């Protein structure tokens, strides 16, 4: 039994630091969504500076759901991933996978499917 615990501990220590950074940014973006007039913390300044363009992209990906009807956590996940999509060299399929994992961890039961659908559309549009 102790080997099972050790295996679980080893898996916890193997968490990708990029995933941990995304979780931290996601939490900051989520909190920012409740106080958008407040000056963003340093880690969010680049994302907030592009928020208008990011939101336009999200609106185009999910035209049946106005931004105001997307849950704040789903919107934060989409904003984070769309920002990274345009500003990093991370493979697009990796970003979609990461978004789905974040949705499973922080969103509702419907979040992973919604986010997968929206971001898959982005992948299709950029082929």
Task: Annotate each language-model stretch with its function.
Residues 1-112, 117-127:
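N-terminal interaction/assembly modules
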């Amino acid at each position: 039994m102790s080997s099972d615990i050790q295996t679980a501990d080893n898996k916890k220590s193997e968490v990708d630091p990029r995933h941990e950074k995304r979780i931290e940014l996601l939490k900051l973006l989520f909190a920012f969504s409740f106080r958008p007039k407040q000056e963003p913390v340093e880690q969010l300044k680049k994302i907030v500076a592009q928020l208008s363009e990011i939101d336009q992209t999200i609106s185009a990906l999910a035209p049946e759901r106005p931004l105001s009807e997307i849950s704040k956590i789903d919107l934060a996940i989409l904003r984070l991933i769309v920002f990274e999509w345009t500003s990093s060299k991370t493979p697009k399929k990796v970003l979609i996978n990461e978004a789905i994992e974040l949705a499973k961890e922080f969103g509702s039961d419907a979040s992973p499917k919604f986010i997968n659908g929206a971001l898959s559309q982005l992948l299709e549009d950029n082929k």
